[in-house]
Amino acid sequence: MMPSRRLSTALAAAVFVGACASAPPIARQQCYNPDAQLASLLQPLESLQAKGCGPGVGARESECERLRREIARLAVVCPAHAPTLMANAVIAYDDKRPGDAQQLLDLILSQPRSYPDAAVLRGQIAIEEGNLPFARRLLEDQIRLAPDHAGLHETHAAALYVGGNLVDARDELTLAEALGAPRWRIAYHLGLIEEASGRRDEAMRYYTEAVAGNPAFQPAGARLRALRAASGVRPTP
């Protein structure tokens, strides 16, 4: 993981690249209809990312880089707009900058209303960093505010699993699935629980279900192949 950087530094650096083309200066710009502005940037960015973002040509940045810079600029102009902060947090996390993502998510979660999607990603980062007490506390607090959010229960299950509480993790996965979490993902998590419990046959059954539900999800396939090899099962061609 890359070291954390202050939020102001991260956003200022992104905006500085295009400062010469900004008119009027960002400090004098007003936040106007941020939902529409964000949508006009996110939609083409997601479309380009689905195809694969190409590199820039010479000194020119790529279109993906330009759109990301504009999303970062919007966070400076509209610093209290939670969806824009969330978009920048996701971009930072995907770019392997968890420190920047964490600071953006903390800004969102400091606002008075509930933002479960922000809590899910913040909890995931805490789990990855080994801060299980914080992750559990955050997720439990957010579940009280948004008890019908599948992602909160699923991420809470992950925190419980990593902490060795397999029974409660399974219960949380049952809730997450009932609230709409994808079955293939639930099957993968259940496979982890069965594997940790020493029930390899059950784990392989769940991993097989996860692979069938989402063949592109590599962790399920990798664990299934490893368990089959350990059991002496020849891999399928």
Feature-to-residue mapping (PLM):
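Structural signature of tandem alpha-helical TPR/SEL1-like repeats
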Residues: 59-69, 94-107, 128-141, 163-175, ...
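Helix-start (N-cap) detector for alpha-helical repeat units in TPR-like alpha-solenoids
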Residues: 34, 82-83, 115-117, 150-151, ...
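N-terminal leader/linker segments that initiate helical-solenoid repeat arrays
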Residues: 20-83
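Structural marker of alpha-solenoid helical repeat scaffolds
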Residues: 77, 110-111, 145, 178-179, ...
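TPR/TPR-like alpha-solenoid helical repeat scaffolds
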Residues: 192-195, 218-235
